[in-house]
Amino acid sequence: DRVVQQALLNILQPIFEPDFHPSSYGYRPKRSCHQAVAKAERFMNKYGLRYVVDMDLSKCFDRLDHELILKGVNRKVSDGSVLNLIRSFLEAGVMKDGAYSETDIGSPQGGVISPLLANIYLDHFDQEMRRRNIRIVRYADDILVFARTPRQAERYKQIAYDILEGDLKLVVNKEKTHTTSVYKGVPYLGFVIYPKHVSIQPKKIKAFKDKVRELTPRN
């Protein structure tokens, strides 16, 4: 199964990769979380975008709709055998509490091709925001939306809700989605981003120190 998935990945990635949104960084060749953080800092400085909506998606990869995944792939791939292979992979089912159950939503985590399918799925969001000239940075399901003013941020947040929940059938965790001023720092991917510098999140520093203490012999 993994061999087949790898073969599919080798076929599909070069087809979709060139047209993905330039501010999408997760699970893409030669792209990293550090580049995503650098892009966010650049947006703050170059375009004067002083407010950021930090979107929180609830169990994103467990909620990907199979028909929408296949529709996304079908935009560029019409080969029925490829589409059928992807469908069979998606609908292979999962073991839950010791029992086998078929699935009609979700991309199995750990699958070789799952990250690419997730990017194909979420590219609809990326391109819809781009079409509206709304600047975003996305690393997998970690999304930042940039705005000039609090009012604009609220408007952009509603647009993002409509696309993610309406078009893509995902669930936005509204309690954990919030708007912040860049001067207070924007936590993202283990860093805190400010207009003029980036620091490591305190909890990451603490975890590192705890690990060092754990590995250091005590006299």
Model-flagged regions — what are they?
Residues 6, 10-25:
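Electropositive, glycine- and tryptophan-enriched low-complexity nucleic-acid-binding patches
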Residues 6-9, 142, 161, 208, ...:
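General helical structural elements
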Residues 1, 150-151, 193-194, 198:
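Short, glycine-/Ser/Thr-/acidic-enriched flexible segments
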Residues 3-8, 12, 117, 121:
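Solvent-exposed aromatic/hydrophobic patches embedded in short alpha-helical segments
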Residues 187-219:
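Active-site and adjacent loop segments of nucleotide-processing enzymes
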Residues 19-185:
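Conserved polymerase palm-domain catalytic core
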Residues 1-7, 41, 51:
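Duplex nucleic acid-engaging cores and interfaces of nucleic-acid transaction enzymes
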